[in-house]
Design a protein with these regions (language model features):
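Catalytic core of pol beta-like nucleotidyltransferases
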Residues: 1-23, 29-35, 48-97
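Conserved G/P- and acidic residue-centered "switch" motifs that form tight phosphate/ATP-binding loops
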Residues: 26, 40
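Short hydrophobic/aromatic beta-strand micro-patches
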Residues: 42-44
Length: 97
């Protein structure tokens, strides 16, 4: 699935949830994904917080939008040890303007 396709499918959902910025990383960002691959997504929630129920519903909507599993990571929840491996792969798909 192309970055443009992911962007088109997820932008309305990201907007609905008030996401400030979203980027794809991993195999999808490198063009190495397969039909069974999940989509790794890093999101910036800004100043808002999400409860567990809302977070799970958000993931469910993303997965329905793509018809794929989504591995969701928030900017604040990004592990400092994984950060150097994730940041070079980032392809921004959404920014709240």
């Amino acid at each position: 699935m192309s970055i443009a396709e992911i962007q088109k499918k997820l932008s309305p959902i990201l907007r609905d949830y008030g996401i400030k910025r979203a980027a794809v990383f991993g195999s999808a960002s490198r063009g190495e994904d397969k039909p069974e691959s999940d989509v790794d997504l890093l999101v910036d929630l800004g100043n808002q917080t999400m409860g567990m129920f809302e977070y799970m519903k958000f993931i469910e909507r993303l997965e329905q939008g793509l018809n794929r599993k989504v591995d969701l990571v928030t900017e604040k929840g990004l592990n400092k040890f994984l950060r150097p491996y994730i940041l070079p792969d980032l392809k921004v798909i959404y920014e709240d303007r």
